[in-house]
Amino acid sequence: PIAHMVWFWMGPDAYTAASVVDEMNAKAGFIWQMGALDFAGGTVVHINAAVAGLVGAYMVGKRVGYGKESMAPHSLTLTMVGSALLWVGWFGFNAGSALEANGFAALAFINTFFATAAAVLSWSVGEALHKGKASMLGAASGAVAGLVAITPAAGNVGIGGALFIGLLAGFACLWG
């Protein structure tokens, strides 16, 4: 309910004429009224999840063996399959947020691809520079970072912006 009150927007179908723009914007959420654009609702989803994760991590405390034992995944193959499925599914999430098959949907689709690819490359390059080689786990992590980073902007930036967001997300999440 809080995310709805803060971010709510009637959508493009509510704007039937120029005379109703102010009336519709007055009903919108606070952040929308301040001029924020969140194409696919990624900011709402990921900020809420991040806050919940931080609170949960603070309450649970450090992992047993943190910093002493390797926390490698059980199966890198399944990790890559999972991240690939996530990447493919994210196309529907971002492009589907346009609510119709139009230029915004195509832009969101293309931006999702380029930002995620850029994040994979930047994470892999950063990891190779720091550790001497890139890893499959790093590539999967970079893909998730790129997907999360582009979601709020997928239909609002050009391809250059998507590449910049992806590159920045890959490096920031590697060293963040």
Question: Over which residues does each language-model region extend?
Answer:
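Hydrophobic alpha-helical transmembrane bundles of multi-pass membrane proteins
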Residues: P1-G176
